[in-house]
Amino acid sequence: MRHNVSGRKFDRPTGQRMSLYRNLVTDLLNYEEITISEPRAKEIRSMAEKMITLGKKGTLASRRRALAFVYIPGIVDKVFEDLSKRYAERPGGYTRMTKLGPRQGDGAEMVKLELVK
């Protein structure tokens, strides 16, 4: 029984799953909106918000933590320079999920995950 077990495995080994998360967060921070399945969006939403919170701290240690997670160094610069200023007065809730309906091929519930303007 899976009582009080959090997180999703997406039927992948740990390395593949973490790589999936890192790629999706990198894409969200780069394009500021992505269309993905609802379970994946729910899983990466908190990770993306943590990256923006690291950007708001602005310390060298937080920059290094962000560089260890996000694949493209230019996106870390975007988080620390642009997004941190945009969300300076906002205490959290940097993302929005909008339901788009089921996917044509397999019926998976799709959402648009975007950064709040």
From Swiss-Prot:
Keywords from the UniProt entry: Ribonucleoprotein, Ribosomal protein
Q: Name one Pfam family in it.
A: Ribosomal_L17
**What SUPFAM superfamilies does the annotation carry?**
Prokaryotic ribosomal protein L17
What is any one GO biological process for this UniProt entry?
translation
Cellular component terms, GO, for this chain's entry? Answer: cytosolic large ribosomal subunit
A GO molecular function held by the record: structural constituent of ribosome
InterPro entries from the xrefs?
Answer: Ribosomal_bL17, Ribosomal_bL17_sf
Query: Per the similarity annotation, which family is this?
Result: Belongs to the bacterial ribosomal protein bL17 family.
Q: How does it assemble?
A: Part of the 50S ribosomal subunit. Contacts protein L32.
**What name has this protein been given in UniProt?**
Large ribosomal subunit protein bL17
> Gene encoding this chain?
rplQ
